Amino acid sequence: VSDEKHLERIIKKLDELGIESIFVPGGDRPEPMGDFNNALDLLRALKKLGHNLNKIGMAAHPEGHPDVSNEVLMEALEEKKDLADFIVTQMCFDAKILNDWMVEIHKKGIELPVWVGLPGVIERGRLLKTSLRIGVGDSLRFLRKKSQVATELMKSSIYNPDDLLKDITEQNDINQTNLAGYHIYCFNQIETTEKWR
C-alpha cells in the first residue's frame, strides 16, 4: 500500500466486494515501499479514513523477530490493540514461550482474541527451511537444546502438530489467556492439512 489515496481505493474495492475482515501483517522489507513505515501506520490510516470492515487482524511474534527487539514488538502491540480486533501469531514450536507471551500480553491489557499460528502437516525439510527464512529462531534454538523434541520432529519426513497442540493445552496458564484458537500455516499443503484436521 503506497499511500492514503491507494489505501482509499483498496477500502472502496473491499467494500464493493463485500469483504468485511482483513489481516494487516507488519511486513519485512528493510525500507518501506510507500508512506507507511509499518502496520501501525496503516492501521492508524484505516481508522482516519473510515471503513466498513467488521474485523481487522494484526500479526504478533511470541518468539521475537529477527530484526525487531521484543520491547519494540510489545510496544507496537500495545499501540495497535485499539486499532485491531484480533491477533494472529507467527508460527511457534515452543508451548512454554507461547504461554508466557500470552500471559504477558494479557497482563499488559492486550485482551484481543489470539489465534496461535502453528505449522500444519508439512514435509520436515520444507518446514525447517521456511522457519529459518521467516525467523522462527527461538523455536529452532529450543529444538537444538531439547533433543527429545528435535528427535520427534525429525523421526519422520512429515511434521504433524499434534504433540505441540497437546503441549499448549497442558500449559498451566493458557486458560487464563485470550486464546481464541489456532491458525494453521499449511504452506499450500491444503489437502494434507485438511486430512489431518
Where are these regions (language model features)?
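Short, acidic/polar
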Residues: E4-K12, V68-E79, P161-Q171
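Conserved, mostly hydrophobic/aromatic
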Residues: L14, K80-L83, V116, I168, ...
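Active-site pocket-lining/capping segments in soluble small-molecule metabolic enzymes
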Residues: G26-G27, G34-G64, K108-D173, F187-N188
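Ligand/cofactor pocket segment of small-molecule handling proteins
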Residues: N52-D85, C92-D94
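Non-catalytic positions within long, well-ordered alpha-helices that form the structural scaffold/packing
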Residues: D15, K80-K81, H106, N175
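Catalytic beta/alpha-barrel core
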Residues: E20-G26, D85-A95, H183-Y185
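Short, well-ordered coil/turn segments that N-cap beta-strands
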Residues: G18-E20, H51-I56, A84-D85, I110-V114, ...
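Active-site-adjacent beta->alpha loops and helix N-cap segments on the catalytic face
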Residues: S2-I10, D28-L49, D67-E71, M91-G109, ...
